[in-house]
């Protein structure tokens, strides 16, 4: 008996059921891929500013383990200490704070970042315009600009001050927009002259320089530590809900495959009875059930890939602040999920076929 052709024939015997099963599995796999892509996107967006600075080390206020913690500051005179440390190639101050803007009677959460013009820590990957050079200028991210209808030359109110938009960046942050200003502008806005809340350090000897800076009483983190902390802060709220939704989608996919194949087995039990009556073993019939679930899962995987591409495009159009990042690892996980779905879904129909009475072939339907 050639079980694979028979598996194909039995699946194709009910095209509408096959199509419904493929679409259902595809939707489940699409949801798994979309949620996984959102998770990767959250991590990528969370770490984007840290990665863009090019810093190897970060000098932070005492007791601080993350960027832009409220109420933390360093004297800008710390810059002289850092720059005078052997092994430091460059050092630049940056000041960030979370703010709520009122844009056309709509509140928008943003991260206001202040940096010294021409030094690292400011706007990067500009799509239009330039980085702010004067204290009354800002650059904003593309999502914030598009959502609130802001363009080059427009005015942006932050607290009691007004700034002119001179640049729009290509990238955006996660859930919050970016507004880039000069460091001095942020100092004036906060009424904190001569202060900063982070110093970026460029060096080719991060371990040695970190030890030297720490020996001077400074709090120093390397970029992997800062990146990890930022990602943890942004993802801890979403981790459990996303995992739950992935689990639900996976269970739904298993049930769809199992029900589709089981219904086909139940309806064609007489044909399977004939196959068993002519000598097919229970193991071979179980393999037939597995072959059918594998074919169905493979078709669902293809459909899920197409649906994922469409869903990703639609989400990017409707909600550009949410990025869906598809990685090779995510693709491997999707294939693995489809395979596990097929294996689990084959259990019930395989048991039904294993216990099928060959006499069914002679009893009619």
Segments (PLM) and residue ranges:
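Hydrophobic, regular-secondary-structure patches
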Residues: 26, 30-109, 208-213
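Mechanotransmission and gating elements of multispan inner-membrane complexes involved in transport
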Residues: 85, 157-164, 168-243, 248-249
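Hydrophobic secondary-structure segments that place a key small or acidic residue at a functional site
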Residues: 94-97, 103-116, 125-185, 192-194
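Peri-transmembrane interface segments
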Residues: 212-255, 263-269, 274-275, 283, ...
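Transmembrane alpha-helical interface segments in multi-pass membrane proteins
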Residues: 273-316, 333-337, 341
